[in-house]
A protein has these predicted regions:
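Active-site recognition of the HExxH zinc-binding catalytic motif
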Residues: 117, 133-141, 145, 206
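Extracytoplasmic and endomembrane cell-envelope/extracellular-matrix remodeling and assembly machinery
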Residues: 39-44, 55, 67, 75, ...
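Hydrophobic or amphipathic, alpha-helical segments that drive membrane association/targeting
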Residues: 2-108, 191-192, 234-237
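Signal peptide-directed extracytoplasmic domains
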Residues: 83-84, 88-126, 252, 256, ...
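Surface-exposed patches in mature extracellular/periplasmic domains of secreted proteins
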Residues: 64-74, 87-97, 147, 151-154, ...
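Short pre-active-site segment immediately N-terminal to the catalytic Zn-binding motif
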Residues: 116-133, 196, 201
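Catalytic Zn2+-binding segment of zinc metalloproteases
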Residues: 129, 139-156, 174
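Membrane-active amphipathic alpha-helices enriched in small hydrophobic residues
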Residues: 158-178, 182-192
Length: 290
């Protein structure tokens, strides 16, 4: 298995910082207990800002990233997404696929319908069902507009957190000493914990959308459970240096158990996978890696 870790070049970091200033307008929908739009509510529309952000990202990607130029494999990737899309609640969103010439395990979805994979995903996923489970999860992120909702949540929490931190600094400056610094540090910790909580919620939503889409499209949702188990084993083996995908998509015991329970509830009609075709595409990816 090739090395499964990516160090992102400076242009990606710079682009991410620029994107941070593009806060999307939160949709006017019912919220759940976490203060986020309820599951399914966020899939009603894609804003112009999301389209612009996605196209800006795509221009940067095509100019800077090492692309895997393989039309045959890209056609295969598009066919898998086309099979999942009608069942993924993306409301006719036109998707664009990109492939990265990188041996690390990674897949991503960018606002506006850009779906990408690393060639290393083929190396890690042993069958078509496992590979599709990752695509279904990423389409779930697009369906629920997680980037837009995350930006909206950040806008809601950062100012209160900053106010609390400044208040703590004022206490310290006024002679409060340790108490003031503790208040300032506590506000920062609370903000980080809030972000982690919403990240876990987003992963659960994307899992649920993905599992249902797999079943409706004729894929065995248990393939996602198998993929999660394989990812969890990799994370444990690699310790402090897991691939970037597992840093942004951590597979916890709770997440694995939830996926197992959900998959067991789903029925698959007309199940079909083409592992022979997948094996051919996987071989092409392995040749490009080595």
């Amino acid at each position: 298995m090739p090395t499964l870790r990516t160090t992102y070049p400076g242009w990606i970091c710079a682009f991410a910082c620029a994107c941070g200033s593009l806060l999307f307008s939160p949709p006017s929908v019912a919220t759940n207990d976490y203060g986020l739009p309820s599951l399914g509510a966020a899939s009603t529309s894609v804003s112009n800002e999301e389209y612009r952000l996605g196209r800006a990202w795509l221009r940067q990607f095509r100019a800077q990233a090492p692309q895997w130029q393989d039309p045959i494999t890209n056609d295969y990737l598009q066919s898998l997404i086309a099979r999942l899309a009608p069942h993924s609640d993306i409301n006719g969103l036109r998707t664009i696929t990109v492939m990265v010439d990188n041996a690390s395990l990674n897949a991503f979805a960018v606002p506006g319908g850009v779906v990408g994979i690393n060639s290393g995903l083929f190396a890690f996923a042993e069958d078509e069902g496992a590979f599709v489970s990752v695509l279904a999860h990423e389409l779930g992120h697009l369906s629920q507009r997680h980037y837009a909702r995350g930006s909206a949540r950040a806008a809601q929490t950062q100012l209160p957190a900053m106010a609390a931190m400044l208040a703590g600094m004022l206490i310290a400056a006024s002679g409060g000493g340790d108490a003031g610094m503790a208040a300032a540090m506590g506000s920062q910790a609370a903000l980080i914990q809030d972000q982690l909580s919403y990240s876990r919620l987003f992963e659960q939503e994307a899992d649920n959308i993905g599992l249902q889409a797999m079943a409706d499209a004729g894929y065995d949702p248990e393939a996602m459970v198998r993929m999660f188990s394989a990812m969890q084993r990799m994370a444990r083996l690699q310790g402090d240096t897991p691939p970037e995908f597992l840093l942004t998509h951590p597979v916890t015991d709770n997440r694995l158990s939830a996926a197992q329970a959900r998959a067991a509830q789903l029925n698959v009609a007309d199940a079909y996978t083409s592992d022979t075709l997948y094996d051919m595409m996987r071989a092409r990816a392995l040749l490009s890696i080595y």
